[in-house]
């Protein structure tokens, strides 16, 4: 009976991952360990409605994420958004994942501070907390101010201790992360100029990029 009542703790970290880099991976690992998640899924976006079109194909981005997390305990890849032929709205993904979990399982949506501050522009954003808790990755250099809608939401739903969030969904909390000044834009620019991205991406990802000649100026 005890196994039937066990609560699973699942996190999701979405992104274009164009390409996936050590900043994404370090954040994912730190959250998974700090929150003692059973699983943290990296979820590549197919056609993110709030971002520019990715530079390389969904198949390449998915392959790089899979290579990046291969053999890393607690991290996995969820490719459901790549199967859609329409913009990948987060609310649709949350509804889909929640339908696969038990009603008492905890689902955590992991967002960077800038993405969190932009939530009011997201499709059906007011419904997100019906399906998940939100974990905001906080950095000491964050300088974007949240809009009033989020200030009100934080006042009503924030939990000071992220590990104390109870129930399957409904709360917001903050997790401090190691600040790594790495961006996918920076990596693409390096590669386009013929420079190396070594130590900014995992070796397996760099090998994939080189084998498929991705992000070169001609691309």
Curated annotation (Swiss-Prot):
Q: Which EC class is the enzyme in?
A: transferase
EC number(s) on file? 2.7.7.18
GO process annotations (BP): NAD biosynthetic process
Sorted keywords for this record are:
ATP-binding, NAD, Nucleotide-binding, Nucleotidyltransferase, Pyridine nucleotide biosynthesis, Transferase
Highest rank taxon of the organism = Bacteria
An example of a GO molecular function for this protein is: ATP binding
Q: Which reaction does it catalyse?
A: nicotinate beta-D-ribonucleotide + ATP + H(+) = deamido-NAD(+) + diphosphate
The record's section on Gene3D superfamilies has:
HUPs (3.40.50.620)
Which one Pfam family would you cite for this protein? CTP_transf_like
UniProt lists the family membership as follows: Belongs to the NadD family.
Spell out the HAMAP family in the cross-references: NaMN_adenylyltr (MF_00244)
The molecule here is called Probable nicotinate-nucleotide adenylyltransferase
Species assigned in the record = Pseudomonas entomophila (strain L48)
GN (gene name): nadD
């Amino acid at each position: 009976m005890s196994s039937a009542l066990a609560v699973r703790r699942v996190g999701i970290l979405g992104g274009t991952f164009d390409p996936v880099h050590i900043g994404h991976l370090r954040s994912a690992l730190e959250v998974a360990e700090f929150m003692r998640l059973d699983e943290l899924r990296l979820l590549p976006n197919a056609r993110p409605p709030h971002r520019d079109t990715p530079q390389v194909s969904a198949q390449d981005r998915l392959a790089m994420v899979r290579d990046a997390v291969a053999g890393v305990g607690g991290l996995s890849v969820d490719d459901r958004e790549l199967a859609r032929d329409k913009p990948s709205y987060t609310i649709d993904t949350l509804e889909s994942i929640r339908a696969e979990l038990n009603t008492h399982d905890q689902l955590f949506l992991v967002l960077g501070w800038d993405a969190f501050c932009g939530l009011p522009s997201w499709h059906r954003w007011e419904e997100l907390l019906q399906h998940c808790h939100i974990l905001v990755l906080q950095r000491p250099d964050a300088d974007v101010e949240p809009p009033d809608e989020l200030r009100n939401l934080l006042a009503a739903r924030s939990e000071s201790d992220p590990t104390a969030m109870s129930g399957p969904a409904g709360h917001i909390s903050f997790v401090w992360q190691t600040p790594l000044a790495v961006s996918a834009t920076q990596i693409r620019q390096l590669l386009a100029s013929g420079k190396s991205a070594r130590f900014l991406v995992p070796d397996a990802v760099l090998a994939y990029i080189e084998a498929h000649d991705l992000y070169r100026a001609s691309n």
